[in-house]
Amino acid sequence: AGAGALGVSGGALGIDSTAHKGAMLAGGTTVAVLGCGLGTRYLMQNEPLRAEIRSHGALVTEFRPFTPAGKHTFPLRNRLISGMSEGLLVVEAGSHSGSLITARCALEQGRDVYAVPGSVLSTDFAGTNDLINDGAYVVTQPVQLLSGYAERYHLDLNRVPSVQQLLAAEQDPGANLPQTSKE
């Protein structure tokens, strides 16, 4: 996001929250696509993050206000996430992860699918590794995700932090990350 790309994720706990926080930390914009209506008391522990996203991006949903989250709402949310994106990055997915639904939607919509490889000894990466075996692009550094879009969208790849910089920023929020120009 610091390179000028828009980050889109699901606003959930874990990797979704990390993606939103990372986008904002890099000085970028992020969109959280919700699997419920606005005003719903879902994942109240993420309310501070949603408030921050409202200031640095947008909360998006196709559901009427106060529609509760449910098993049927998340696949619909995942379809919107992939539909709003040029490419989809799956960081960690077990064999039954909802991220695989998003990946399937992305492929059906003609989007690029990227995956971070993980240990073959961990079931937490079974789905991610299957995506790679099925032809997803492998990503081990953030710049790999954006390099194919840089010219078309005028992205500044010099502003893409390395994995090491992201890890340092997670440990020390005051750590310097490449910042997007705010001209």
List where the protein language model places each region.
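Glycine-biased, small-residue-rich flexible motifs in mid-sequence functional cores and linkers
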Residues: 1-183
